[in-house]
């Protein structure tokens, strides 16, 4: 198997909010998904991203908050594993702490637009533009697109607020735009790092811990049982799509048949 992958992560996206998101519903009509995947605890952004890309629980990668803690031994993330195999990988993001998701030399291309300066809505739009252009020109094996607007809206206005719902609509409009613009043989995986409640997250509440995992591209028919899915299962699944075995240290499982 040799599928190229676009991985989109909407920071703070609650699955129950997608019911009223028109752009999301367009995609969900023709996909394979679970709205009951689980993230890790503590349910905060950097910790959850580390668990996604390193496929292990926070106690094992060492970052248990939004401050990066170098692992006590050498670990390889999804980016690193693909880079070792000479595969082209790229990242587009608006939150600077995500720079620590791999060794610096593992990324062929990296674009960070500071959401706090430019605004997360504008950052969503510009990062999507950049990802579309790069994918169509370079055809990377993995492109990671981080859309940070929902988390920003949740903290400022409250999860499930009108502004939060608008941030989801913007994010999904960008997802639809990307899906329509890139080659149709790309796998497209859409997920979140955590949810949220009131103006915060980080607890064991279901609103914080439950995330969607959506397979919306060329990989739809390859996905197997989506029961008991955890965020640490995403990296092994992408590795399998790319044709590689998971790293020996990874703790998640592939979700492919």
Give the ranges of each region predicted by the language model.
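Feature captures the catalytic ectodomains and active-site-proximal regions of enzymes
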Residues: 1-257
